[in-house]
Amino acid sequence: MTISNTRPITPDLIASHGLKPDEYERILNLIGREPTFTELGIFSAMWNEHCSYKSSKKWLRTLPTKGPRVIQGPGENAGVVDIDDGDCVVFKMESHNHPSYIEPYQGAATGVGGILRDVFTMGARPIAAMNALRFGSPDHPKTRHLVSGVVAGVGGYGNSFGVPTVGGEVEFDARYNGNILVNAFAAGLAKTDAIFYSKAEGVGLPVVYLGAKTGRDGVGGATMASAEFDESIEEKRPTVQVGDPFTEKCLLEACLELMQTGAVIAIQDMGAAGLTCSAVEMGAKGDLGIELDLDKVPVREERMTAYEMMLSESQERMLMVLRPEKEEEAKAIFVKWGLDFAIVGKTTDDLRFRILHQGEEVANLPIKELGDEAPEYDRPWTPAKVPSPLATNDIPQADVADTLLQLVGSANNSSRRWVYEQYDTLIQGNSLQLPGGDAGVVRVEGHEAKALAFSSDVTPRYVEADPFEGGKQAVAECWRNLTATGALPLAATDNLNFGNPERPEIMSQLVHAIKGIGEACQALDFPIVSGNVSLYNETNGQAILPTPTIGGVGLVRDWSKMARIRFAVADETILLAGAPKSWGTHIGQSVYMRDIHGRTDGPAPHVDLAHERKVGDFVRGLIGDGLVTAVHDCSSGGLALAVAEMAMASGIGATIAAPAEHDAIPVFYGEDQGRYVVTVANGAVETVAARAKAAGVALPVIGRTGGDAVKLGDARPVSVNALRSAHEAWFPNYMGGDLAPDN
């Protein structure tokens, strides 16, 4: 099928391109005439939510994005942060939600491919990947099929490309039944004096197309990613791109080789809206026009129209502004790697975006208004509604030991081994901590002691209950997970997944979550350096849980002192850093209430950022001085789940006392923030206690390691083997069932 280049512009056609009547009026006023069909497609791609951030830009500007280590914040392909010694880490997280629901394998695979390109476009070699996945209820007929396809797609692309997957999340909730989330993170290493940007410079310079050929896959993908779903979703399958990780690996090597020659003035990967977005962004950032001749674009399908070529989202492609004298040298590199190299246009001084096809001018538009001066909205939002606290007599009871077994074997708290064993976690040979701990850790090649830690976090049920506190908590938990390895948290990337921003109650979630994220990042010196917004995650008016995923990076100065979650040996002292007087108090929005009693009421836990910082800095100091033997942050499932995970990771049991005269349920299952379980060798307990007192950090002794069971207070002991069996069984049992019908 080919799309005609001369279709009449009708209200239905305008609406099908995701443009509102007032936006179309704005186009008419801007260009003084009716747009051509190709121009309509270009406006649709550049002015949609996915490319323009028109609903969120106002609020994103409020986030803290600067810091002493920040080399490049938001606005480029990825953020860049200094990690000393002339090295920097380049990273970003981005969603591929809508495509992954329609076509799970290719949607997830190209999500990984896209984020890897964002990183190596900046001149960095990718060293780590993570993915945060959210699926519908396990008993929904599509869920198993989607899990299987997405996990295979993530693994298939990342493994073949050759980047280790070191962390991530997998969560189930009925609110994702119609819209799953696939948030992909990648990080790479570069030299601080060799970072490449997308801003075009110089007039009359060649614009070069690099990589794979252009096909019809993904035409209209960015527009599809900015729309709600309805019953016609299956018809959108052709808008999903198809990826080839081996071509991408060649593209990586060719780009890095080319970058060493001094030939590259500006470079931009072709992601959402393909050739359109990459050309417009390069030109608009550099205050230059761009002229493209589509007859020179390498294609793999016959009779492609200008519309299709401009909006194709074929993968593994780059656009570059090149030094003309380096043309032959550059071409030789790409030919060597078996990739296309074609001069498809030039930079101009007239701020116009001109497209030529078969001798005709099919588009001539103002480039700034397409790019950095696209429409921006201040959408209405409602005041936040926060649930009232639970009454003290409204904490339902359950057997503490039975609850522990039930939770470790539940859909959302069980082992994710089935998932991450499909990913290559060790490729490149630098992985120090694998999925299953608080954070993934990767050695920095060329340095004896330096490593980087990575974590991805958000608790959507908290954000739903209180978007402001939930936004704070996502940042705080990410910061805490990095700290728990001994890393100094450096910076973060945010992936904001929400429903339809035209609904004031959804816009309210987005606004308050961003406010919470900003406040936490400010307080924790954890700036946001890159990110992505995914809106319209709704099907038939049912929105997802608000899910502002935070991906963070931390610096480990000496990985030989790095902490892990597993108990080291028996007969060590267990302490709870940052504990309130009764160790745990907050049961609202806990997994205990949700998974044991089916209740989702009550407020989200409060995040005291000063407390969070004080306790985290204290724990990191203990790790750096070699005074603790294991560390694990307390999050979902509270103290009980944290201790159980430490026991399961090591095979060593634990006996935990219980503070007298306090209800055991909030003590063990409360989800108070800013707490870490730490173990200390007996000879170091006094030193650690003295340091805690000096720092003003609560550090009660709560128990001892040893034995082959976990005993919580007066509850019966539960053997580590029983916990492991329950923990490891859920995922393989679920996925081993007959595949649910794909309908």
UniProtKB/Swiss-Prot annotation:
Instruction: Say which domain of life the source belongs to.
Output: Bacteria
Q: Where in the cell is it found?
A: Cytoplasm
Which GO biological process entries does UniProt record here?
'de novo' IMP biosynthetic process
UniProt entry tagged with the keyword RNA-binding: no
Keywords in alphabetical order: ATP-binding, Cytoplasm, Ligase, Magnesium, Metal-binding, Nucleotide-binding, Purine biosynthesis
> What Pfam family does this protein match (any one)?
AIRS_C
PANTHER family tied to this protein:
PHOSPHORIBOSYLFORMYLGLYCINAMIDINE SYNTHASE SUBUNIT PURL
What is the similarity comment for this entry?
Belongs to the FGAMS family.
State the name under which the record lists this protein. Answer: Phosphoribosylformylglycinamidine synthase subunit PurL
The species this protein was found in: Sinorhizobium medicae (strain WSM419) (Ensifer medicae)
Report the gene name: purL
